[in-house]
Structures are given as C-alpha cells and as structure tokens.
Amino acid sequence: MARLGVVGYGPLAWADGKRTADIEKVLGEGRVLWMETEHFKFGSNFGFARAPKDPKARRLLKGELKRLHKKCKKVPTSASKLDPWLRLHLYAQRAEELYDEFADLAGRPHGERRLGEKQKLLILLFEKKSDLARYFKSFCGRETQQTQRHTHYGTGHRSLVMTAEGDDGPRDSETTHAQFRYFAMQMFMDAAGGGPLWLQYGLGHVYEREVPCNMINCGVRADESVDLASQYEWGKKIRKRVKFEGLVVPFEELTTKTDLGYYGHVQAWARVEWMLQDRARFAEFLGAVLGKPSRARQVAALAGVYELEPAAFDAAWRKWCAKNYR
C-alpha cells in the first residue's frame, strides 16, 4: 500500500464535517471506492474502460502502468481493459504526478502542503452525470451535471468533481483523462492562490492536450463561427488567426478578460505554449502573478521576466505561432 503512495482506504473524513459514509447514504452503500494519498482524498465509481485506440494515448497509458508496476508488481505493465480499482490507482498516480509538476513549476518547496492548501484536495470520479448531480446538490448546494471545481469554504477543502459521461453518452478513457488534466491544473492554481483566467485556462489546455482526443473543454459563443469537424485542431486555428492582428486578443485585454469564448481559449493555450519554451522564465512569471492577478501585476511580471512590453509580447508570440503551428 505504501509503495503505491496510498495512505489509507475508506471510510474517510470529508469536507464540511461530513464523512464518506454520509456520501454513501445519498449515493448508495458500496458504490464508491475511497482512497487517500499524500495530497489527495479520492472517491471513484468509475467502471471498466477499454484502453485507448490512439497509438500515442496507448503509449502514455503503458508508461503509466509501468510506473505503477515498479511500485507494485501485481499491476500489469499493459492492459486492454482497465478495472475500477486499477483506474482509481491510475488517477491517484496522475494526480500526484501533476501536483508535483505544478508545484515545481510554481517554485514551491517540497513539503506536506506544497501549494499552501489548508486541507488535502478532494477528487470525485463519477461514471454517470446523475451521481455527480446528486453529490453537488446534497453536499455543495449546487445544481449541475457538469464536471466542475468546488471550494468548501467552511473547512477550506478544494475539490474536483467530474463525470465520465458527456452529453452524447459515456466518454472513452483518453477523453476522460484529458479532461481530468485540464481541471486538475486549474485546481492546483486555485490552491496556490489563484491566477488570471487566461493563464489558468491556458495551462490547463496545455496539459489536457498532451492526451490525444477530440474533445474541447471550452464553449463556443453565439457570435463565434467554429467548424465542428475541426474544432479540436487548435494549431491550425491559431496559425490562421495570428496572420491578422484584429483577430487576436491583445495581452493587455486578455489579462482581465473573463469571457474568453472558443478563440480566447485557443489563444490562451498558444500563449502558454510559447511561454513554456523557457520553463524557468514561465515559472518565474507564474510565481509573480499567483495570488496577484491584476493587469498591472501581469504587465510588470511580463516586463521583469520576459523583458517585453505587451505589444512586443504579442508580436513575438504571433511570429512564433506562424512558424511552429501547422
């Protein structure tokens, strides 16, 4: 158990003075697997899932299984089908690895609460939207069927509650994994003090898109025209748009923008990709704006770290996009 990074299994204490037994009274006893690791508490009723068909996604999964196998020889190094317990251990490993990567990127020292969170982070993985909706209504006072982050202000717990069911039915394992990465990186930024929305979204998309899938984790505004067949081909989209200055959101405007729309999300992703070409500089920029996301702070951090004024940043980024995306 310890070699897998597991601190313990259920029952567990949860948020707002509740326990996992209270959650099971609502969702049904024995329907959720509970587990605790160094930085997280998990609940999952994910069912069986097939391994990805995409070659890159299969290689990613095989690498994850090999890392788990090194910790516990009972874990297979490859699998065509993932059972509920294996999926839970995979997500626990994914969460801890992403946590450490974000903490390193943010320049946080090693320790029990590297990001400054008051409590362990909570992650709930539901197979169906109906279970997610019941949980949100009963324990968060919210009406939703969508994967979301939530803060329990009474006890200081931050949580990610997600479902493997989309509007068109069950999602495959790689799509669910990609969405998990997107929301997890945002939760970590919340725990570290919060940051500008474009940076939260952009960093989340960078990590999300490392897992091949055709899902997009953003909405399309009514005033935007997006071809559904190619909506996930962000490299092609941004390469075309940066040719025209009027089609990109200037950095100074992006710093405080709250409704990014589809193309704003694409641009946020591409800006973070450009900034991550120098990870040391990006880490310095991230550390400078965490908890201090004002426009003035972002502009000052850009000048101090990248030695660029906003207009020069826009020009350098557009030139890089035109050269590197196809």
Where on the chain are the PLM-derived regions?
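Short low-complexity stretches enriched in small and charged residues
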Residues: M1-R3, K74-L82, D227-S230
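N-terminal pre-domain segments of enzymes
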Residues: M1-V26
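Juxtacatalytic substrate-recognition/specificity segment
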Residues: W14-A15, V32, E36-P196, R295-A301
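General structural signal for secondary-structure boundaries
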Residues: D16, I23-E24, G47-A49, L88, ...
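Short hydrophobic/aromatic segments of transmembrane alpha-helices and their interfaces
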Residues: E24-V26, G169, G264-H265
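Feature detects long, helix-prone N-terminal segments enriched in hydrophobes
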Residues: V26-L27, E64
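Acidic/His/Gly-enriched intrinsically disordered linker/tail segments
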Residues: R142-T163, G194-R326
